[in-house]
């Protein structure tokens, strides 16, 4: 059976413009849908789609800018709405009503004109701001990260000496949880990316897929003392982790292995932060990298300094697929406990000192690097492939139509 899908993209580059883990997942989801039907795409992202894909048709592509930025009065009104109507999705996600009404009109005119079997988008926030909740009976929603868990982890990092901030954060977490359950209880299919953190009892686990992977089965440790971090720098948990690593951990590594260098591959709009990164000795902030495969190939060790956030790390799946030895925090390997073992597939750092010591150990232990590389790559091949992703999407949709 062939299906007709309408895919809405509002934020991330897709089909040829993959510049972060979210872009990769969006693109693979479109490809999975195109594998079982025809996909019409409405793209509101500021980056045009640059790659043709089989069974995909771009029916609308236009970036709608925030021509009227929010005023102080509007911001105050938005904040008040979160407390006056805590379980109303618009209270949490509406930013620019004028822009969102234009987006809603564009989608509505096309969704009603054509008999689409399903309307598809990623993230609850996009479903709300694009006015898609009205299509709940045919809405496929890739939630990806659990919104409730994300707010709880943000709550855990609030200073205990700021009780009002903590109380409002807790209030938001409770509101987001109720709102998430309400939305996912009505829409027809939802997916999430972390096996141990489902946002709703009906949500289906859908594995992340690496954007790049190793093309051979031979792994040789490169003893060049190059460390690599990959990730969208403007994503708050990434920015915090990178900052912490550069300030607290990297200098300790260079005391023992002085020629160690750190390459950071990831886009950012924060030129001041980008400049600060490059001002640190041994640190090379590269910005957006077109060919990530070369960066992975050139690195001796890949690290994931993630201390909070939700979902699962696409960069962890990429590093495993590329057969690279990995040192990560506990948060960086969330959701992989059933397929990965510490010290077998990766090394896990519990403290700053432990992080530095384990990186130094790998930089000076080629045999351990090779063992980790082989084991990690085998796990990625068996559990994190596109085939797994495609199969999960197809089964979920076919089950719905039985």
Where are these regions (language model features)?
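Conserved acidic donor-binding segment of nucleotide-sugar-dependent glycosyltransferases
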Residues: 344-353, 361-367
């Amino acid at each position: 059976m062939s299906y007709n899908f309408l895919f809405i993209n509002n934020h991330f580059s897709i089909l040829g413009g993959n510049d972060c883990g979210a872009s990769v997942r969006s693109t693979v989801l479109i490809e999975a849908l195109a594998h079982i039907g025809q996909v019409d795409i409405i793209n509101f992202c500021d980056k045009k789609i640059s790659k043709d894909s089989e069974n995909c048709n771009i029916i609308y592509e236009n970036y709608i800018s925030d021509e009227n930025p929010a005023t102080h009065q509007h911001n105050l009104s938005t904040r008040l709405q979160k407390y006056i109507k805590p379980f109303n999705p618009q209270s949490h996600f509406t930013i620019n009503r004028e822009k969102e009404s234009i987006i809603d009109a564009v989608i509505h005119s096309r969704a009603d004109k054509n008999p689409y079997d399903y309307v598809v988008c990623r993230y609850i926030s996009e479903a709300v701001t694009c006015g898609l909740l009205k299509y709940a009976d045919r809405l496929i929603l890739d939630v990806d990260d659990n919104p409730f868990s994300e707010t709880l982890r943000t709550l855990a990092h609030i200073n205990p000496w700021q009780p009002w901030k903590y109380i409002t954060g807790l209030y938001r977490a409770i509101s987001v949880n109720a709102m998430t359950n309400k939305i996912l209880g009505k829409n027809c299919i939802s997916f999430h990316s972390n096996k141990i953190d489902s946002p709703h009892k009906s949500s289906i686990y859908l594995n992340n897929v690496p954007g790049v992977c190793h093309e051979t089965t031979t792994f040789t440790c490169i003893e060049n003392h190059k460390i690599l971090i990959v990730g969208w720098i403007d994503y708050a948990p990434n920015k915090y982790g990178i900052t912490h690593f550069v300030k607290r951990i990297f200098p300790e590594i260079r005391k023992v292995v002085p020629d160690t260098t750190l390459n950071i591959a990831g886009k950012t709009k924060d030129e001041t932060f980008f400049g600060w990164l490059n001002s640190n000795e041994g640190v090379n902030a590269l910005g957006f990298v077109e060919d990530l495969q070369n960066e992975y190939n050139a690195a001796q060790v890949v690290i994931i300094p993630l201390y909070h956030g939700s979902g699962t790390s696409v960069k962890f799946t990429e590093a495993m697929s590329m057969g690279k030895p990995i040192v990560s925090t506990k948060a960086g390997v969330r959701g992989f406990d059933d397929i990965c073992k510490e010290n077998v597939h990766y090394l896990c750092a519990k403290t700053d000192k432990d992080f530095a010591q384990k990186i130094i150990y790998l930089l000076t232990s080629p045999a351990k690097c090779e063992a980790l590389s082989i084991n990690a790559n085998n796990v990625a091949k068996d559990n994190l492939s596109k085939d797994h992703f495609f199969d999960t999407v197809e089964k979920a949709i076919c089950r719905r139509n039985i």
